[in-house]
A protein has these predicted regions:
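Active-site Gly/Thr loop motif
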Residues: 48-63
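Catalytic alpha/beta core of large soluble enzyme barrels
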Residues: 17, 21, 38, 55-59, ...
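Extended, well-ordered alpha-helical scaffold/bundle regions in very large, multi-domain proteins
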Residues: 1-38
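Polar, glycine-rich mid-to-C-terminal structural blocks
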Residues: 34-50
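Acidic, low-complexity intrinsically disordered tails
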Residues: 230-264
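Hydrophobic alpha-helical packing residues
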Residues: 8-12, 65, 179
């Protein structure tokens, strides 16, 4: 993220040298040599020591870039933001921007209709260990796209393909905090919580504030009640191959039998 930020700002400054700065550049934070990372210190001064916890480490030469920006200016007043890309991601077969996988198998509805979204990376991983079959599809449907209740799936695959409600919100917030310091605008960060209550929400949003997030986007929670799947029993038996016998053909008379009244 640091590299993307660095070269995005550098490119805007180089464009300013070629085509001129944006109209209100003078007096802006850019004109003062204040980069997104520097704004963390400004927030810390406003709040007081101990009221913001953001990692300030860097690897690139930001002092040189500050001098370039102050000398050449900026072509763009706003350079970076992270937007939600849910539908676009579904169309291209990718995950949503900075989001964890919502579900490994679900049906999405929008103005264009309904379509099924499946995590093809999971499909490939299960094929490698000969576990992608009709039974697995059945289990994923019944468990709302989660692998947690499927005992035959190895733990390492469950961890790798954990869905958004199976990832602790603190990790999403911490990741967002490390991105935010490089972004001059903001990011659309959705938060997920399985069993919401006042205490959990208080802790979660206090942490987001403490970690220097400018904002959050949707808070998504699971419904307190779900419809009962009446055809589901113990999923542990789904992977057991049944010794089903081929059905016997029904008895029927021969069309060549001259004594059959139905064939006359």
């Amino acid at each position: 993220m640091e590299m993307i930020s660095y070269y995005a700002i550098k490119s805007s400054s180089d464009l300013a040298k070629e085509r001129g700065t944006y109209s209100s550049y003078e007096g802006s934070l850019w004109s003062q040599g204040i980069m997104p990372l520097d704004s963390v210190s400004i927030v810390e001064q406003q709040r007081g020591e101990g009221y913001i916890e953001v990692d300030k480490s860097m690897k690139m030469d930001w002092d040189a870039l500050k001098k370039k920006v102050k000398t050449q200016g900026m072509r763009n007043s706003n350079v970076m933001a992270i937007a939600p890309t849910a539908t676009i991601a579904n169309i291209t077969g990718l995950t949503q921007s900075i989001e964890p996988t919502y579900s490994n198998l679900f049906v999405k509805s929008n103005l264009s209709g309904e379509f099924t979204v499946i995590n093809m990376h999971l499909v490939d991983a299960l094929k490698e260990i000969d576990m992608w079959d009709e039974v697995m599809v059945y289990d994923l449907k019944n468990l709302n796209g989660s692998l947690e209740g499927i005992n035959r799936v190895p733990e390492e695959i469950k961890k790798l393909f954990a869905t958004s409600f199976e990832v602790e919100p603190k990790w999403l917030i911490e990741s967002a905090s490390r991105r935010q310091k490089w972004i001059d605008q903001s990011q659309s960060l959705n938060l997920y919580i399985s069993d919401p209550n006042g205490k959990k929400l208080d802790v979660m949003y206090r942490m987001a504030w403490l970690k220097g997030l400018k904002t959050t986007y949707y808070l998504r929670s699971r419904s307190a009640t779900t419809s009962e799947k009446s055809t589901i029993t113990n999923l542990e038996l789904n992977a057991v191959k049944s010794a089903a016998q081929a059905p016997e053909a029904p008895s029927a008379c021969s069309i060549l039998d001259p004594d059959c009244d139905a064939c006359q």
